[in-house]
Amino acid sequence: MTYVLLGAVSFVFFYLFDVFNIKGKSFLKVSFALIGLITFIYSSYKIAFLGSSIFFHKGIRLISALLFLISLFLLFYSLFLELPFKKTYGEKDYNNGLITTGTYALCRHPGVLWFFFMFIFLFFYTGSTLLLMAGLIWTSLDILYVYLQEKYFFQDMFKDYKKYKKTTPMLIPNLKSIKRCFKTIK
């Protein structure tokens, strides 16, 4: 349970990343992003391979491993490749333009989708019962985090964000957004 809480604390660090991002404090922004990321990866690793587990058939485990890797790639793609990396995560200037194409045409927070699927498939691969609980708790915290981003940060960071909210679902893609995603993905 300690690692579940440690993983939860990483979301506080991610929130502080946004606070210092909007204040233009690049050193603190990067520091809290790295602390949050390292804390989260460490917690996830420990939970995935510790404690009791359920046995799943080898075929389920293999398919789940593949789907986990796809989800992990999509998470990395959405957060670190589609967004301009240096401007988003490194520079002082936070207003780097709103991305509305690719996976960001699918929904406003595609990382939350990939995050959820990543933990579901990792559970079916490892069988870790604690991982299932942690994944659900952390996904709930991720949803709270993106809600807070929308409420307190993104309106100020991106001038067209209100328009984007009207045209793109927050978390659950619809048929129109799925078509727009495939049409604009690079």
Stretches with model-predicted labels:
Residues 100-101, 105-113:
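Histidine-centered phosphotransfer motif of kinases
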